[in-house]
Amino acid sequence: MNARADRAGDTVHRVPVLVVGGSLVGLSTSVFLGRLGVRHMLVERHAGTSVHPRGRGNNVRTMEVYRAAGVEQGIRRAAATLAGNHGILQTPSLVGDEGEWLLRDIDPGGGLARFSPSSWCLCSQNDLEPVLLDHAVELGGEIRFSTELQSFEQDPAGVTAVIKSRRSGEHTTVRADYLVAADGPRSPVREQLGIGQSGPGDLFHNVSVTFRSRRLAEFVGDRHFIVCYLTNPEADGALLPVDNRENWVFHAPWYPRAARPLEDFTDERCADHIRRAVGVPDLDVEITGKAPWHAAQRVARQYRAGRVFLAGDSAHEMSPTGAFGSNTGIQDAHNLAWKLAAVLGGWAGDGLLDTYDAERRPVAEATTARAAARSAEHSHPGFAPPPGTSGGPQGGILNVALGYRYPGGAVLGADPATPVVPEALTLAGEPGSRAPHLWMSRRGERLSTLDLYERSPVLLSDADAGAPDAWHESAVRLAEELSVPLTSYRVGRSAGADLTPEDDVNWTARHGTPPGGAVLVRPDGFVAWRSQEPVPAEETEPTLRHVLTTVLSLG
């Protein structure tokens, strides 16, 4: 990939951002950039979206960012078939023994509604990617399937890449300000950049087998699980429903290091393995597809190299247990997209892009460890955990999915000693944490505070204070002075309020700021800063100027 990109005779195609890779993370990057008005091109070597049902667990934070991007409802429609499936079951077979529920419900007490307007969604990758693709195209994304990156070079002003159509063989030179590599765990972009990885490496190998069985639903009964770990030592595996009727996925352990070739997984052997695992010798099984895969625990040693950024599996690999992998990648893309938009739009400095690594890499390091610990706990087929893995920190799944924090980066006032994943889920307005969810009324419209955060930084200030307009007026002046698209809302119950909290909620207390205080929230919904003590009216403008210029790396 080191061939020179400025080949004579090529027409140069210019875009601000080139996205390499068009799976979940690449398509999500396209959607997020499109929402922010950033012109871009996405290239994907495969002919279309995924055809294999994998990567199905979309956690609540992922659904929040899809909500902000206007795509949540389309995803839920695509996921309607499995909307009633909950929990993780472990059992020796589906006959006789009811089994043990390792996790009966992600939100058994309904307490998640206190923290989020969204919820988990079980949508397989082959159903999710077409929704993202349609949305990306509607937003103006230039999506090129059957197109691969041949080479790229970067200089202080941008990236020059050569892409090749796998259909026509035609080469095109692309000149971009930035390149986002969402090109998978074997990332050629990462390899060319010479970026190493940390972590123990490969954890286990499986073969994913899709099959049809009309009778299997009889033995599953009303146990509508997300996944069932079948623990027959002679034929273990993980069973997942596709439609709860006749289409299923079975993950069988594969031991390539034991010289067991992939060719051993014939249709006949796979069908026999499934029958023994389920406990029904005469079960009807029609194999429809097979795909090998491996789980690993690796994190890239850096996420940025000049004008190139790693996202998704190119940046980190983790065990699928807990459904953290694709979710972490999608949230990488969400973190990066607004920063690229800000720098390209001229309202943030280049230093803001350095915070992508500072924020997202510690999250991946913490999450990969917890994913491996969950694989050990759930005895994932084929996983022989290294010593000490099962004793690693896990935390509640919501703490990992929703409660993670950025102790450093584009935040001001965060405690650098704060663990990335907290012991308890609070979301109480701490800088570096996802901003609190509160229901508000705006001119008769009901909305979550999270619905306010996408296209610009947002300042929330107290409309019921002694000087209710001080923060707001300072924000308006600074937006013009600094050319920052800062949006300001006065929150309270007075006549001048822009937003009114529901149910007598004390919004300042929920955000951890005093009466008369203010909170700055980033476009990705994370708290950038909050006032910790009362600020005199005449000090609001210099205070806010310092916050904005620091967070956005201006000046």
UniProtKB/Swiss-Prot annotation:
Its EC number is 1.14.13.-. It is an enzyme of class 1 (oxidoreductase). Residues 366-395 are annotated as: Disordered. FAD binds at residues 16-45, 303-313. InterPro entries: FAD-bd, FAD/NAD-bd_sf, RIFMO-like. Its cofactor is FAD. It holds the Pfam family Rng_hyd_C. One of its GO terms (molecular function) is FAD binding. SUPFAM superfamilies: FAD/NAD(P)-binding domain. Keywords: FAD, Flavoprotein, Oxidoreductase. Involved in developmentally regulated synthesis of a compound biosynthetically related to polyketide antibiotics which is essential for spore color in Streptomyces halstedii. Belongs to the PheA/TfdB FAD monooxygenase family. This is Putative polyketide hydroxylase.
